[in-house]
Amino acid sequence: NGYDSLHQLPGGMRFRFVDAGHILGSASLELWFRDGGRDKKIVFSGDIGKNGNPIIRDPQHITEADYVVIESTYGNRFHKDLEASIEELAKAVKETFKRGGNVLLPSFAVGRTQDVLYILDRLVKEGALKDLDVYVDSPLADRATKIYMAHPEFFDAEAVNSFKFRSSAGMRIHFTTTIEESQKINRIKSGAVIIAGSGMCEGGRIRHHFKHNIWRRECSIIFTGFQVPGTLGRYIVDGAKSAYILGEEMAIRAKVYTIGGFSAHADQGELLEWLGAFTNNPRVFIVHGEEPVALEFEKTVREKLGLTTYVPHPGEELEI
């Protein structure tokens, strides 16, 4: 299935992908090579997923390496509990519908959109929400969801048995790909959950839905992903009263919810758990994190795991 198979490369090198548990198909890489007549092994973590992520399996642990290159996106923080975040999402949707508005949910097309659909379906089945109309207004998310549907072999056991990314009795899912279909959503004044890109509101169809809903007090915007400083999403999260959207200044009257437990990235504890699975004290290179975060994570790794660590500078080359 793409994971766990050993592949040969010229010069005696070999590699294998293992499930990183981040999004569908994400992988860590094991690479074996010869050095001075001896076999050596380097592991590249890739983006490591969070334990208990919806739909996909938890990250697979690796136990041996001479060198490990590990990400540090959230190397200095711990995530909010997922179940508490799911309860917050249900509450936000119910409050919005009670006010007679629409829910706008900016979302990444791959991973987050599918997770949100899965969670909404679960909330409907549990009776926490009912009679939902969900619009996935993103051609890329539509294509990504079709890929998810085609590969249930990568799902965890719970997802395999519970959700098929199709409409059910209590939740109608509408995938809209054409501009005409997208524009029709603008006629809906209440009772819709509109999922659209981009996740940080820098482009995509979410801006068009903002134009028709962001000035309405009865509507809401639910952010489930980190908003980078300088983006429209971050501007809204930080409490802006108005914003230029599609060339027009608009008042931001919709209620803004920021729900923090949906990250697909491992937090500090889960990164340490993944790294702690190595039994032979590899040398660790910490990458893919803002410098203060990477340095703080390096300190934690040294203190808690006793490993030799290094944080490379951007563009730095290292010989191993």
PLM segments and residue spans:
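His/Asp/Glu-rich metal-coordinating catalytic cores
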Residues: 1-115, 121-128, 133
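Short, solvent-exposed amphipathic alpha-helical segments in soluble enzyme
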Residues: 31-34, 59-62, 119-126, 151-153, ...
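Hydrophobic, well-ordered secondary-structure elements that form the walls
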Residues: 206, 284, 309
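Active-site metal-binding loops of divalent metal-dependent hydrolases
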Residues: 23, 46-48, 72-74, 108-110, ...
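Generic long, charged, amphipathic alpha-helical segments
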Residues: 244-274
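C-terminal structured "cap/appendage" subdomains that terminate the fold
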Residues: 271-302
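Redox- and metal-dependent alpha/beta enzyme cores, enriched for Fe-S-associated oxidoreductases
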Residues: 215-251
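Hard-cation-handling environments
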Residues: 92-229
